[in-house]
């Protein structure tokens, strides 16, 4: 398995230590029951990560939708990043991208039969989706990017980890890209290593499994991206930072 080059700014370790102390204390307040986690009667699946940047969250959320919508009425709740609206918004036929944000809008276009909602307050959003007058028949809710939102206690926590930036090799913000210490992975029921190369070997998988150091109650999976049929397009890149899966597929 080829080594992954992870840029860590060691000069920022003191700041990362302060940040990590704050995150550790916040998590402990939840663990001790001082901050309350709320359970709901409806099944809730959380999909998220503990690093900033893309880990393939959208395609994995869409996979869950395809898997579940055959038998259940699915609702997806997102924060609605960069939207112009406030509070709870349930997407409908006339909902614009400005009202719910780019990714929720695209998801609703792709899966018109699901409930697609946004709300910064996840507990309030779940309450609305459980209201039979607002979203009748909701049977399962998928929380988008909610691994750190501990006010909700999901029935299943799915943690996504980028193959090219394993959490066991990363550091806390701002020295690295981790939102919380690595032991935060203990809250996950399922851990998925995403963006694996298609030619990854069984030996590589065994090495990765050992590096992840998961608990017996956790399940580990590996996924790769499969791109669809190519279509002619014109791309203009105004700002380039680091290669995304899209950039690598275009190159």
Language-model segments: what does each one mean?
Residues 1-40:
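A transmembrane-helix-recognition feature enriched in membrane-embedded lipid enzymes
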Residues 34-82, 88:
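Walker A (P-loop) phosphate-binding motif
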Residues 48, 78, 161, 195, ...:
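Short beta-strand/turn micro-motifs composed of small residues
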Residues 73-74, 157, 220:
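Hydrophobic anchor at the start of a short beta-strand
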Residues 81, 86-110, 114-212:
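Phosphate/Mg2+-binding loops and adjacent switch elements
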Residues 131, 233-239:
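Short, surface-exposed amphipathic charged segments that create phosphate/polyanion-binding patches used
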Residues 220-230:
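Beta-strand-loop-alpha "switch" segments that mediate conformational coupling across diverse proteins
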Residues 240-247:
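Conserved small/polar residues in nucleotide/adenosyl-binding loops
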């Amino acid at each position: 398995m080829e080594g992954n080059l992870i840029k860590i700014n060691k000069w920022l370790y003191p700041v990362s230590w302060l940040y990590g102390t704050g995150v550790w204390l916040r998590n402990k307040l939840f663990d001790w029951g001082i901050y309350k986690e709320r359970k709901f009667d409806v099944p809730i699946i959380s999909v998220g990560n503990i690093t900033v940047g893309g880990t393939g969250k959208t395609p994995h959320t869409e996979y869950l939708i395809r898997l579940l919508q055959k038998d259940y009425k699915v609702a997806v709740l997102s924060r609605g990043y960069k939207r112009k609206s406030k509070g709870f918004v349930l997407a409908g036929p006339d909902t614009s991208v400005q009202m719910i944000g780019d990714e929720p809008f695209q998801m609703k276009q792709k899966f018109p039969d699901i409930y697609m909602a946004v709300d910064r307050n996840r507990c309030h959003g779940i309450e609305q989706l459980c209201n039979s007058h607002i979203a009748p028949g909701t049977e399962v809710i998928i929380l988008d990017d909610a691994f750190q939102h501990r006010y909700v206690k999901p029935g299943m926590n799915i943690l996504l980890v980028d193959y090219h930036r394993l959490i066991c090799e990363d550091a806390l913000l701002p020295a690295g890209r981790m939102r919380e210490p690595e032991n935060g992975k203990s809250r996950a029921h399922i851990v998925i290593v995403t963006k694996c190369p298609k030619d990854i070997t069984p030996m590589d998988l065994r090495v990765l499994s050992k590096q992840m150091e998961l608990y017996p109650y956790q399940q580990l999976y590996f996924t790769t991206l499969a791109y669809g049929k190519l279509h002619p397009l014109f791309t203009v890149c105004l700002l380039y930072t680091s290669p995304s899966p899209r950039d690598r597929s275009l190159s």
